[in-house]
Swiss-Prot record:
Protein name: Lipid-A-disaccharide synthase
Organism from which the protein derives: Citrobacter koseri (strain ATCC BAA-895 / CDC 4225-83 / SGSC4696)
CDD domains referenced in this protein's UniProt entry, alphabetically: Glycosyltransferase_GTB-type
Family that this chain belongs to: Belongs to the LpxB family.
Native organism taxonomy: Bacteria, Pseudomonadati, Pseudomonadota, Gammaproteobacteria, Enterobacterales
Protein EC: 2.4.1.182
Pathway: Glycolipid biosynthesis; lipid IV(A) biosynthesis; lipid IV(A) from (3R)-3-hydroxytetradecanoyl-[acyl-carrier-protein] and UDP-N-acetyl-alpha-D-glucosamine: step 5/6
Catalysis performed (reactions): 2-N,3-O-bis[(3R)-3-hydroxytetradecanoyl]-alpha-D-glucosaminyl 1-phosphate + UDP-2-N,3-O-bis[(3R)-3-hydroxytetradecanoyl]-alpha-D-glucosamine = lipid A disaccharide (E. coli) + UDP + H(+); a lipid X + a UDP-2-N,3-O-bis[(3R)-3-hydroxyacyl]-alpha-D-glucosamine = a lipid A disaccharide + UDP + H(+)
BP GO annotations: lipid A biosynthetic process
Length: 382
């Protein structure tokens, strides 16, 4: 009698965040099906968990139109080759992790060949280019969504979707230790502390840093003991921020940090940040915040017409109301930002209410996402 083939899962991750998700999923699946086989496009973490890499993840990790155009032929070749090889292999399930521009077409190709497909991490279809939901519905058997309002969106279009919670909510404690974080950063337990996070992209740091620094200067007038911590994602962004600081606020003393964004949020009484994943992380760190964002006028004009949501920050989208002040474009200026931050630094009723809501929202999306994702894969594989 022929030996039964082990459970075979094909995966494609396109960047570091996807590699982390893929590794967590593989770990959860291996705990239940020790002899399962994992193949595809994998980063170092997925490979360390036993995923056989047909291509290195870096091959897909390109950003920006110019870079993508330069690599387009190679990307199309990889996608065609994966379609052919996965079709030959006939895995039990294919899991495309994020990287929607690459993965959703691949998922559609494989679904036509009778392979069950999962898209892990919903693109922001609920916010803009909503018609993409129809292609996603045609291409996948199941979307795994981090956030409850994402599932509600897919339900409207009858696209199978499972809310699994957010891995970041699983990783972060419900009650972070502010004093321990301050000890790590060398900040007094008694001082007022503000975190400035002007974004991870060069364009964001260029647009926001001057206003954020001027805001800190204004707040120092009310709180002379104010410690300002600025975590920057890499050396390039740090150099850029230092250049802007030398021009607009050379005398302002700040703690520049290499990475350590999470520690800065946990340690701070309030944060001023660009929108994006940082706002979700700040919510999970239980740090009251103000979101300030500015973009080129034409980009903003276009975004206002394309974006279908009332809010830009994830805490507000989760709460369904303006929990966190969002100051965009012309409103993103030092006096308005400082005015919004003052009550948060006072550490009174406003910040305590925000903290309590953050904790409730954290509990809502803390669902052991790795295990939930593994459940979905195994159910589909049957």
């Amino acid at each position: 009698m022929a030996e039964q083939r082990p459970l075979t899962i094909a995966l494609v991750a396109g960047e570091t965040s996807g590699d982390i998700l893929g590794a967590g999923l593989i770990r959860a699946l291996k705990a239940r099906v020790p002899n399962a086989r994992f193949v595809g496009v994998a980063g170092p973490r997925m490979q360390a968990e036993g995923c056989e890499a047909w291509y290195e993840m870096e091959e897909l990790a390109v950003m920006g139109i110019v870079e993508v155009l330069g690599r387009l032929r190679r990307l199309l070749h990889i996608r065609a080759d994966l379609t052919r090889r996965f079709t030959e292999l006939q895995p039990d399930v294919f899991v495309g992790i994020d990287a929607p521009d690459f993965n959703i077409t691949l998922e559609g190709n494989l679904k036509k060949q009778g392979i069950k497909t999962i898209h892990y991490v919903s693109p922001s279809v609920w916010a803009w280019r909503q018609k993409r939901v129809f292609k996603i519905g045609r291409s996948t058997n199941m979307v795994l969504a981090f956030l409850p309002f994402e599932k509600a969106f897919y339900d409207k279009f009858n696209v199978p979707c499972r809310f699994i919670g957010h891995t970041m909510a699983d990783a972060m404690p419900l009650d972070p230790d502010k004093n321990a974080a301050r000890d790590v950063l060398g900040i007094s337990h008694d001082a007022h502390c503000l975190a400035l996070l002007p974004g991870s992209r060069g364009a964001e740091v260029e647009m926001l840093s001057a206003d954020f620094l001027k805001t800190a200067q204004l707040l120092r007038q009310t709180y002379p003991d104010l410690e300002v911590v600025v975590p920057l994602v890499n050396a390039k962004r740090r150099e850029q921020f230092e250049r802007i600081k030398a021009e607009v606020a050379p005398e302002l003393s700040v703690h520049l940090l290499d990475g350590m964004g999470r520690e800065a949020m946990v340690a701070s009484d309030a944060a001023l940040l660009a929108s994006g994943t940082a706002a979700l992380e700040c919510m999970l760190a239980k740090c009251p915040m103000v979101v300030g964002y500015r973009m080129k006028p034409f980009t903003f004009w276009l975004a206002k017409r394309l974006v279908k949501t009332d809010y830009v920050s994830l805490p507000n989208l989760l709460a369904g109301r303006e929990l966190v002040k969002e100051l965009l474009q012309e409103e993103c200026e030092p006096h308005a930002l400082a005015e919004a931050l003052l009550p948060l630094l006072a550490n009174g009723k406003t910040s305590h209410a925000m903290h309590d809501t953050f904790r409730e929202l954290h509990q809502q999306i803390r669902c052991n996402a790795d295990e939930q994702a593994a459940d979905a894969v195994l159910e589909l594989a049957q």
